[in-house]
């Protein structure tokens, strides 16, 4: 019973996070993306639920692909127009699901190998490694047909000041920074639940955010 409840909660967190990410990718700014990424970190131990996060984020943010219908203007028969547009949209969601799921799987694998001792240094290394892997993946994706998948550009137009950091380390670096912000928010919530260190975590994070701006 408890395992089923935990699984349902995990799915709910992944679904809500994916919806928030989808809104964040269309609206821009940290207001949506920070809690979305915090929820992604909270479910990252489950590649399947992480895939749900990725799928919902892209299906919501790229729903404009359905507006390509009718595709008769590029020679697609009217009867096939909507199925083709829907297939493109679903493919985008599936691609995002696979990529985010692979990222989560890699994180769980690394957590059980390179960082299995559980010390502070190991956890910090794991955090920086996973955030950097995401950022590097966005750099590589930017040079591929999947260039549209990524959170690096989601800071615009909502947070131009933080987006300005791109002049030093690019969109991949912005993605890494956002992953770190999401992790901080997640850890602050965990500290609040434990009743230990929440205020300190919140204060340090806000100071760093202020400096980044």
Residue ranges, per PLM feature:
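Membrane-embedded alpha-helical bundles of multi-pass enzymes
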Residues: 2-213
């Amino acid at each position: 019973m408890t395992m089923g409840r935990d699984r349902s909660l995990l799915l709910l967190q992944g679904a809500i996070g994916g919806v928030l990410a989808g809104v964040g990718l269309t609206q821009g700014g940290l207001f949506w993306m920070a809690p979305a990424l915090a929820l992604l970190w909270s479910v990252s131990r489950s590649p399947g639920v992480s895939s749900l996060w990725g799928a919902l984020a892209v299906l919501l943010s790229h729903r404009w692909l359905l507006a390509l219908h009718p595709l008769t203007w590029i020679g697609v028969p009217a009867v096939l127009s909507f199925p083709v547009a829907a297939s493109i949209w679903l493919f985008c969601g599936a691609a995002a699901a696979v990529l985010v799921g692979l990222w989560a799987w890699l994180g769980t694998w690394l957590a059980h190998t390179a960082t299995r001792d559980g010390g502070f240094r190991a956890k910090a290394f794991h955090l920086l490694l996973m955030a950097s892997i995401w950022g590097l993946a966005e750099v590589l994706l930017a040079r591929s047909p999947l260039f549209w998948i990524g959170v690096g550009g989601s800071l615009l137009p909502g947070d131009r000041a933080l987006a300005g950091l791109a002049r030093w380390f690019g969109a991949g670096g912005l993605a890494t920074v956002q992953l770190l912000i999401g992790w901080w928010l997640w850890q602050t919530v965990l500290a609040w639940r434990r009743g230990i260190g929440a205020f300190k975590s919140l204060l340090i994070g806000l100071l760093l955010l202020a400096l980044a701006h």
